[in-house]
């Protein structure tokens, strides 16, 4: 016998994440990553995600290195635009801001920044695509170690990212995933 009680559970007082991969949605529905169709799908999924008491969202700064065999890669899905100009890295945060705003609109309270290093020992960089001399190019991935030029990249990127998180008043509810 089951008794149904007409009440709602209180709001969770813990962070709860279930990894939702934006690239998988694009692949499944055959839409371009971060096209307007994709953003609408993301909104629908975010709303359902919150209904299931999830309140922290995996945020794909760069293409996730998760669940991918060494040497293979997932569909490119990065919220950060990267350009290499005169040997320096220039970052665009517009898509990340749109993601954050959409998450908040749907009731997501916490943000888990995607993995900064590969699985299985953090030996490699995640896939990062940049505009180099006017063309899109994979500048990091399985072919690049997690040290060297990638360290220079992070030294340029992370201070700018954390400044944006403070500006958007979400630094205190943002967590960084290093590796699995």
Where are these regions (language model features)?
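Aromatic-lined carbohydrate-binding surfaces of glycoside hydrolases
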Residues: 1-180
């Amino acid at each position: 016998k089951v008794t149904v009680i007409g009440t709602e559970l209180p709001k969770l007082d813990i962070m709860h994440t279930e990894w939702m991969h934006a690239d998988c949605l694009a692949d499944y529905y055959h839409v371009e990553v971060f096209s307007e169709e994709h953003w609408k799908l993301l909104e629908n999924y975010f709303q359902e995600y919150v209904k299931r008491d999830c309140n922290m969202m995996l945020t794909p700064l760069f293409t996730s290195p998760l669940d991918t065999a060494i040497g293979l890669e997932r569909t490119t899905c990065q919220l950060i635009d990267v350009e290499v100009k005169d040997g320096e890295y220039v970052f665009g945060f517009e898509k990340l801001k749109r993601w954050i705003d959409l998450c908040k609109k749907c009731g997501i309270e916490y943000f888990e920044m995607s993995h900064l290093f590969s699985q299985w020992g953090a030996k490699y960089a995640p896939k990062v695509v940049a505009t180099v001399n006017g063309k899109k190019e994979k500048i990091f991935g399985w072919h690049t170690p997690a040290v060297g030029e990638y360290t220079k990249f992070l030294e340029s990127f992370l201070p700018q990212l954390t400044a944006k998180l403070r500006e958007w008043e979400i630094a205190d509810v943002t967590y960084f995933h290093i590796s699995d």
